[in-house]
């Protein structure tokens, strides 16, 4: 970790248009910030204990394609991501973020369960 940089990325799915339209811009930004903090705070705490200070990115969009796109743009050496394991039926109906990242990402991907 001494000569490597680390990026911690979270991608929130966009809210449906009818929900976005019902919120002010400030409310939408506050919601996105709160949801991002829920995801990132425990990870940042864990990484800090191991003296890792990552660059943090937060985006809104389709998680699978956005993760792959950012990995390509930022020239990541590897993507390490969790797999929530929705099961075969969940993947069939919705597709998993991990599956979409694997399909769209030219960067090596390590899935952690």
Q: What does each of the following model-derived ranges do?
A:
Residues 25-38:
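A short acidic, glycine-rich active-site loop
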Residues 16-20, 78, 104-113:
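Intrinsically disordered or low-complexity boundary/linker segments at protein termini
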Residues 11-13, 82-84, 113:
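Short secondary-structure boundary segments
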Residues 18-21, 68-69, 91-93:
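Short, well-ordered secondary-structure micro-motifs
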Residues 45-79:
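Structural beta-alpha unit
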Residues 78-103:
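Glycine-rich, Arg-bearing micro-motifs that act as flexible, cationic patches
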Residues 1-22, 46, 50-55:
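Small/aliphatic-rich secondary-structure junction motif
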């Amino acid at each position: 970790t001494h000569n490597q940089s680390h990026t911690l990325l979270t991608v929130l799915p966009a809210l449906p248009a009818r929900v976005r339209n019902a919120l002010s811009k400030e409310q939408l930004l506050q919601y996105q910030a709160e949801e991002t903090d829920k995801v990132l705070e425990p990870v940042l705490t864990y990484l800090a204990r191991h003296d890792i200070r990552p660059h943090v990115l937060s985006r809104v969009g389709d998680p699978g394609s956005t993760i792959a796109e950012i990995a390509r743009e930022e020239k990541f050496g590897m993507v390490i991501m969790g797999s929530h394991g929705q099961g075969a039926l969940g993947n069939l109906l919705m597709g998993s973020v991990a599956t979409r990242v694997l399909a769209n990402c030219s960067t090596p991907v390590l899935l952690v369960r």
